[in-house]
């Protein structure tokens, strides 16, 4: 039995799919990780975003980040399953080493949470409308 290591997986799902299909694909991603010995610790579904460049003629993708513990021998099966899933445009699995985790904790400690650009533009519009009324 190998020691389970901490990994982070970023998945970009075809943003042109319906919400139900995206949710079903996320369930498939979770199931593939679990079937290959992975214990999911955290899932962050970012949502639909415009990609920097088209992938397979798709310009919008639904992003998700998954932290899981798993054996290194199971990664090949996970990658193969993701590669053959037509709804997954791109994926990346990274081993989270100790120095990287320490750096992440420091960043979280000293950083301020900033919303998405869409949230900021709505807040700016609200502030401008309040200022205009005064």
From Swiss-Prot:
Annotated GO biological process: translation
Domain of life: Bacteria
Signal sequence extent: none
Keywords, ordered alphabetically: Ribonucleoprotein, Ribosomal protein, RNA-binding, rRNA-binding
Entries under InterPro entries matching the protein: Ribosomal_bS6, Ribosomal_bS6_sf, Ribosomal_S6_plastid/chlpt, Transl_elong_EF1B/ribsomal_bS6
GO molecular function, a single term: structural constituent of ribosome
Gene Ontology terms: cellular component: ribonucleoprotein complex; ribosome
Known role: Binds together with bS18 to 16S ribosomal RNA.
NCBIfam families per UniProt: S6
Family of this protein: Belongs to the bacterial ribosomal protein bS6 family.
Name of the protein in question: Small ribosomal subunit protein bS6
């Amino acid at each position: 039995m190998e020691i389970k290591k901490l990994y982070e997986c970023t998945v970009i799902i075809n943003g042109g799919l319906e919400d139900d299909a995206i949710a079903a694909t996320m369930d498939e991603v979770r199931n593939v990780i679990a079937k290959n010995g992975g214990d999911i610790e955290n899932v962050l579904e970012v949502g639909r975003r415009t990609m920097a460049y088209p992938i397979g003629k798709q310009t919008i993708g639904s992003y998700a980040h998954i932290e899981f513990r798993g054996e290194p021998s199971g990664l090949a099966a996970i990658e193969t399953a993701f590669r053959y899933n037509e709804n997954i445009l791109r994926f990346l699995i990274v081993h989270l080493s100790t120095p990287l985790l320490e750096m992440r904790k420091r960043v979280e400690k000293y950083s301020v949470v900033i919303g998405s650009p869409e949230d900021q533009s709505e807040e700016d519009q609200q502030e401008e409308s309040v200022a205009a009324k005064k």
